[in-house]
A protein has these predicted regions:
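N-terminal, post-signal peptide beta-strand-biased segments of exported outer-membrane/organellar beta-barrel
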Residues: 1-80, 356, 382
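Outer-membrane beta-barrel porins/channels
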Residues: 12, 57-58, 63-421
Length: 421
């Protein structure tokens, strides 16, 4: 159904339905190098591991063909990063916590005198409901027009606690009193000020529970051309304007972290457009039982609105290059294999701990069992190999000593049942 115009060339009239279930397993890891973590003159690396799994991702596709017309529809998860959990938090939160402690503690606390406990869970799903019509103009050409309604649901849950180690509070209090008395305060005034500082440290906790929703409409057009054994196709999806609105149930933070937490405040709207997409494809029937295809996708990310206009920092939109082969072993079995290379045009300013991408290539294999002329079963598996992305000078401490390395893995298994009524 990536070539909806081609549905008009289905050999038989009637209804066809495909029910698909996919299982996806991903990791999203960050290796953060910084002198902040210890403040002892050494650069250390903290590793933050994110895990995401979606055991059941359902989708349904259907088409009804009558004469030169074909009417199609689908419901599926068409985007979003799924659900990911970082049990040890994220580098951006630890760096913010250390900065907060330095501000409140007036630089008199080192990281070995306190502990930071944090965790973050994020989720992003885009559900798509698509309807359209295909029309066969003649024996060579068919066209398609339709639209997809996209509904976004997501959010973040997380916490961050700062705890002074045993005896540190008393030591800090004595240091603050000594410093303030040297500045001219009386003992009583200095003790009162030190008590306030200690209370500020005890209150230096972050907590977030925020849901996000939004929707947008994607108009779609397509064309399909058949010339003997050669099939050419093109599809264009227009940009969907979408704003994500916060429904924040809990947001707890000290005043010093107000700017840091501002994007998660209740009612805040953030642009999150779905980019326009162009798809071009060609397939050729080498033998009656053997077919090969190549395909190209372009996502116009640089012109899709994002938070703080970060899309402008991309070097270019996303390019995807695909190739595949399909072989009918006999009337009962069909096998296939495919390859995809993805280039996002990434930049340091585009990448962040809560949203990062890595260039990649994917390899997949599949098979079909034709139980009857009407009933068939598809199975497929693919994995993605990502190129690590290194972002330098993340916390403004110098490129050579301050960097984050983003890495990912992805494995997906799918099963589909197809029936022709």
């Amino acid at each position: 159904y990536s070539n909806p115009a081609g549905l008009a060339f289905l050999p038989k009239d009637g209804l066809q339905v495909a029910l698909t279930i996919q299982s996806a397993y991903q990791t999203r890891d960050i290796a953060a190098t910084s002198p902040l973590w210890t403040m002892d003159g050494q650069n250390t690396v903290r590793k933050y591991e994110g895990k995401a799994s979606a055991p059941v991702i359902p989708s349904i596709h259907a088409v009804y063909k009558k004469g030169d017309w074909a009417f199609s529809g689908s419901f599926a998860i068409v985007g979003g990063g799924g659900k990911a959990s970082f049990d040890k938090g994220l580098p951006m939160f630890d760096a913010a916590a250390i900065s907060l402690v330095n501000t409140i503690g007036q630089g008199m606390l080192s990281p070995n005198q306190y502990t930071i406990n944090s965790a973050m869970e994020g989720r992003q799903y885009i559900y798509g409901f698509q309807l359209g019509a295909s029309y066969k103009i003649n024996e060579h050409f068919a066209v398609f027009a339709g639209a997809r309604m996209n509904y976004f649901t997501g959010g973040y849950k997380g916490f961050l606690d700062i705890n002074l180690k045993e005896g540190v509070a008393e030591q800090l209090g004595a240091e603050i009193v000594k410093k303030l008395m040297a500045a001219g305060m009386t003992l009583e005034q200095a003790q009162q000020a030190a008590l306030q500082k200690s209370q500020q440290l005890n209150d230096a906790k972050l907590k977030l529970d925020c849901d996000q929703t939004g929707w947008g409409l994607t108009p779609i057009i397509g064309i399909d051309a058949k010339f003997g054994k050669l099939n050419l196709a093109a599809k264009y999806e227009f940009k969907a304007n979408m704003n994500i609105e916060n429904d924040t149930h809990d947001i707890t933070a000290p005043d010093a972290a107000a700017d840091f937490m501002a994007p998660y405040q209740n009612g805040v709207n953030t642009p999150s457009d779905l980019p326009a997409m162009l798809s071009l494809a060609a397939s050729y029937e080498i033998l009656p039982s053997l077919r090969a295809s190549v395909e190209y996708h372009f996502f116009d990310d640089k012109n899709a609105g994002m938070a703080d206009g970060k899309q402008k920092t991309l070097k270019h939109g996303t390019h995807e290059y695909l190739a595949g082969v399909e072989w009918d072993i006999n009337k009962l079995f069909t096998v296939s294999g495919g390859y995809q290379k993805t280039d996002y045009g990434l930049s340091d300013a585009f990448q962040s701990d809560t949203s990062f991408s890595c260039d990649s290539y994917s390899v997949g294999f599949g098979g079909r069992i034709n139980f009857t002329e009407a009933l068939s079963l598809d199975v497929a598996y693919f994995w993605t190999t990502y190129s690590d992305y290194t972002k330098e000078n993340v916390r403004g401490l110098g490129a050579s000593i301050d960097k984050d390395v983003y890495s990912r893995t992805n494995k997906v298994f799918g099963v589909s049942v197809n029936y022709k009524f």
